[in-house]
Amino acid sequence: MRIVLFGAPGVGKGTFAEILSKKENLKHINVGNILRNEIKKESNIGKEVQNVVRSGNLVSDSLIINIVHDEMKNILNKKYKGFILDGFPRNMYQSKELIKMTNIDLFVNIYLPRNILIKKLLGRRICNICDKNFNVSNIQQDSFDMPPILPSKDCIQCNGHTNLIKRKDDNEDIINHRLNSYESDYIPIIQFFKNEKYNLIDFPLRRGIRDFDDFYSILVNYRKNEKLK
């Protein structure tokens, strides 16, 4: 199973991908985490990426494509049943390169209104031990009910005892810049895959991670439909 998740920064696609990857034994290719690991290692790639992130811009197409291609090759040597792409493709050029690289079974566009996204992004945190993503925001507005996502004592690395770190690029000015860039890039991408009649499904969130069962039903229904063909 080869899945691509779309969604603006902070929508929660990484969390959904992580849960789905474990449930279905799929490799979670999280481009953002890969880049952050390179920064942490202070590699040449990491230094290049860090300069771009600090300015609030996006990393070059060629670098992203090479990273994704290498990750896909590594999957062939492991016992995964497929992969979930999270954070790729980011523009039309990357979309067309993806189609050349492999066949995708399902695209899912996870979305939230912009004002809710900003609140979520301002509350985003990273564990300084296990590097997992969490969120301290408690959003109770209109039909949205999204409590905080905090570390669990069941984590084998941090046991829930950790200092949560705020990303340097999670301030309101950079957040708005990134959302503007995302909307500019992704509206054409999503329309492209819809027009080309790929399997693309829109999935609106209301309760955050508690919407996962409905999200998972998309995959279940896809499999049922494929068996009927």
Curated annotation (Swiss-Prot):
Keyword Transit peptide on entry: yes
Subcellular location: Mitochondrion
Chain residues that bind AMP: 36, 57-59, 87-90, 94, 178
UniProt entry keywords in alphabetical sequence: Iron, Kinase, Mitochondrion, Nucleotide-binding, Transferase, Transit peptide
Annotated domain remarks: There is a putative zinc finger domain which may bind to iron.
Its biological purpose: Catalyzes the reversible transfer of the terminal phosphate group between GTP and AMP. Has very low activity with UTP, ITP, CTP and IMP and no activity with ATP, GMP, CMP and UMP in vitro.
Family: Belongs to the adenylate kinase family.
Record-given protein name: GTP:AMP phosphotransferase
Species of the source: Plasmodium falciparum (isolate 3D7)
Gene assigned in the entry: GAK
